[in-house]
Amino acid sequence: MFNVRYPNDSFDRYWQPFLDNKHAVSSTQNVTSADFWNLPPPDVFNTAFVAEQDAPLVLQWPPVALQNDSYYVSLYFADTLPDNSRTCDVYINDYLFFKDLNVTSAGLSVFATQWILSGLTTIILKPASPSALPPLINAGKVFALFPVGRLTYARDGIAVATLIASYHFLSVEISWQM
């Protein structure tokens, strides 16, 4: 278990491992992250956090208290065993997030674009019938959009684009990610 960032994550998201070796299980499954709409790095599927048999998996995650706001929440799952599946119900702060989630070795994600969170967040994965295997999770992502202050006016954007175009002969590459 290690931190994942750029270049392993092309969007330079920061993926931090959940520090609990008791429930961590390595996986040799090849999950194709290109099959996911938001392209998680393949490395996040190398380890799963697995519950005890017939018990729910309870996580306090993220590890910090969140401000009361509307968040995007994405959770990622891939069975660690080939040709297997397990079914669970996913709760966030005691509210049902997803019912009868069928996790296979191919992997899947579930997400919400507007989920209200505040303070410490608890994720609970409860085994669901007819699953004989305990629930697991590989990764999660929570983020919020926030205002960045003054907006750029269209005329300013046009002026910058014109200025950049006028210096094109210099072959200067400009990066907006500084």
List where the protein language model places each region.
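Compositionally biased, intrinsically disordered or flexible polar/acidic segments
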Residues: 1-178
